[in-house]
From Swiss-Prot:
The keyword Transferase does not apply. Gene3D superfamilies: Tetraspanin (1.10.1450.10). It is a multi-pass membrane protein. Belongs to the tetraspanin (TM4SF) family. It comes from Homo sapiens (Human). PANTHER family: TETRASPANIN (PTHR19282), TETRASPANIN-11 (PTHR19282:SF198). Signal peptide: none annotated. One of its GO terms (cellular component) is plasma membrane. CDD domains: CD151_like_LEL. Keywords: Glycoprotein, Membrane, Transmembrane, Transmembrane helix. This is Tetraspanin-11. InterPro entries: Tetraspanin/Peripherin, Tetraspanin_animals, Tetraspanin_EC2_sf.
């Protein structure tokens, strides 16, 4: 155990240790939250990623997962550095806090930037995906994503079911007389899309575009808020770490 020059220094260092220990606990919990949000985003939204032109949404989630894992590992290091009072461990802990701060800030900014251009991207890309790529050879993943999108959000077409009338899929022989894909149906059975009546298919104002846009916007805001929120919390941790490191450096003998 270390020895200090004065009782006052001893009390101050112990006080800083307790503050840093409390911070590190909440920091570790925050890391678990960041990791959970990142994994949940990818697992729950992975089915929709194929209909997005940009990879920014997925990139933000992967960055959050990386940051969450790094936070939890760093948290364990922090507990050790505080208990053992090792200046080298505290320096490493501070550097890792700084790296994580920058990583989470980047993830939060990416989510915010993508949120700003989400509407325009969806309008351009979703219409083209439905018209040109759905049901085509080599586009199995896109087809599955659109089917899941229409079933999950109970919608049909980008803006309305009429969007399907001029799609490549509906004009092909393989459509077997369907007016819309079967995934537009309220109860999905083979070739149910041959009857495009409101009692049979989803007729939603704004179509899938409006619902997907709102869905992604909500989760981008959540990702951004979690990333930036935990990053701001880390500023307190870096300040406390510097203070403790400085005290230990001054008063050890």
């Amino acid at each position: 155990m270390a020895h200090y020059k004065t009782e006052q220094d001893d009390w101050l260092i112990i006080y800083l240790k307790y503050l840093l220990f409390v911070f590190n606990f909440f920091f570790w919990v925050g890391g678990a939250a960041v990791l959970a949000v990142g994994i949940w985003t990818l697992v729950e939204k992975s089915g929709y990623l194929s209909v997005l032109a940009s990879s920014t949404f997925a990139a933000s989630a992967y960055i959050l997962i990386f940051a969450g894992v790094l936070v939890m590992v760093t948290g364990f290091l922090g507990f050790g550095a505080i208990l053992w009072e090792r200046k080298g461990c505290l320096s490493t802990y501070f550097c890792l806090l700084l790296v994580i701060f920058l990583v989470e800030l980047v993830a939060g900014v990416l989510a915010h930037v993508y949120y700003q251009r989400l509407s325009d991207e969806l309008k351009q890309h979703l219409n083209r995906t439905l018209a040109e790529n759905y049901g085509q050879p080599g586009a199995t993943q896109i087809t599955a994503s659109v089917d899941r999108l229409q079933q999950d959000f109970k919608c049909c077409g980008s803006n309305s079911s009429a969007d399907w009338q001029h799609s490549t899929y509906i004009l092909l022989r393989e459509a077997e007389g369907r007016q819309v894909p079967d995934s537009c149906c309220k109860t999905v059975v083979v070739r149910c899309g041959q009857r495009a009546h409101p009692s049979n298919i989803y007729k939603v104002e704004g179509g899938c575009l409006t619902k997907l846009e709102q869905f992604l916007a909500d989760h981008l805001l959540l990702m951004g808020a979690v990333g930036i929120g935990v990053a701001c919390l880390q500023i307190c941790g870096m300040v406390l770490t510097c203070c403790l490191h400085q005290r230990l450096q001054r008063h050890f003998y």
